[in-house]
Amino acid sequence: MTKRTLEGTKRKSIRKSGFRARMATKLGRKVLNKRRQKGENS
């Protein structure tokens, strides 16, 4: 049987797009602030 096309690894995706990855850069912090202003996740 063939493998699935998308077999994501949790660790990689979290390191790439998790909260701490966002906080590490200026643009990432901007993203978080915009999301906080939108206020759908709180």
Swiss-Prot record:
Keyword Chloroplast: yes
Keyword terms, alphabetized: Chloroplast, Plastid, Ribonucleoprotein, Ribosomal protein
Pfam families tied to this protein: Ribosomal_L34
Keyword DNA repair annotated: no
Signal peptide residue numbers: none
Principal location listed in the UniProt entry: plastid
InterPro entries in UniProt: Ribosomal_bL34, Ribosomal_bL34_CS
Gene Ontology cellular component annotations, sorted alphabetically: chloroplast; ribonucleoprotein complex; ribosome
Location(s) in or outside the cell: Plastid, Chloroplast
GO biological process: translation
GO molecular function, one term: structural constituent of ribosome
Similarity-based family: Belongs to the bacterial ribosomal protein bL34 family.
Descriptive protein name: Large ribosomal subunit protein bL34c
Species annotation: Olisthodiscus luteus
